[in-house]
């Protein structure tokens, strides 16, 4: 459900027989995916971090 990175990781473990199990695995991972780090981009940001990012972008836009 969602990111191609999560499906690629589970498909790499077992492409053939894991086809049916992959759907079940994805459903159980969805909550975990929200907290995972994809190549430096954190998916489940807390509100404090969102405020920090928005403040940084405002500063950059002023320059």
Swiss-Prot record:
Composition-biased stretches (Low complexity): 1-12
InterPro entries: OCC1
One Pfam family recorded for the sequence: OCC1
Sequence segments annotated as region (Disordered): 1-40
Segments forming a coiled coil: none
Family: Belongs to the OCC1 family.
Protein name: Overexpressed in colon carcinoma 1 protein homolog
Origin species: Bos taurus (Bovine)
């Amino acid at each position: 459900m969602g990111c191609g990175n999560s499906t690629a990781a589970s498909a790499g473990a077992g492409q053939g027989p894991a086809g049916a199990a992959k759907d079940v695995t994805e459903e159980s991972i969805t909550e975990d995916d929200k907290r995972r780090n994809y190549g430096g981009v954190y998916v489940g940001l807390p509100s404090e971090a969102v405020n920090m990012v928005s403040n940084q972008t405002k500063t950059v836009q002023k320059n």
